[in-house]
Swiss-Prot record:
The keyword Ribosomal protein does not apply. Belongs to the TFS-II family. TFA subfamily. InterPro entries: TF_A-like/BEX (IPR021156). This is Transcription elongation factor A protein-like 7. It comes from the Eukaryota. Residues 1-31 are annotated as: Disordered. Keywords: Coiled coil, Nucleus, Repressor, Transcription, Transcription regulation. One of its GO terms (cellular component) is nucleus.
């Protein structure tokens, strides 16, 4: 008669797949993945609520906000130009140490 894997010479020679009950961390991994999913779900729900709130604005309110946003973007562009100019002046002054 053939012996099972565990009975041969007192040592297991063939590898049996471990069950989830034997992995103490398996349950933790499942909970962690579920927690991540739950966090992502809650975050997407909050973002959706914010999007819905913005859709209810009147056209006049959105126009005012668009103008303010455009003004802020223009200010950012001008500041970037200034920083580039300052940076290029600084690098040019390093090149010529007169």
């Amino acid at each position: 008669m053939q012996r099972s894997c565990n009975e041969k010479e007192g040592k297991p020679k063939c590898s049996e797949p471990k069950r989830e009950e034997e992995h103490p961390y398996g349950a933790f991994e499942g909970q962690r993945l579920e927690g991540n999913f739950r966090q992502r779900l809650l975050q997407s729900l909050e973002e959706f609520k914010e999007d819905i709130d913005y859709r209810h604005f009147k056209g006049e309110e959105m126009t005012g906000e668009e103008e303010e946003m455009e003004r802020c973007l223009e200010e950012i562009r001008s500041l970037r130009k200034k920083f580039r100019a300052l940076h290029s002046n600084r690098t040019h002054s390093r090149d010529r140490p007169f």
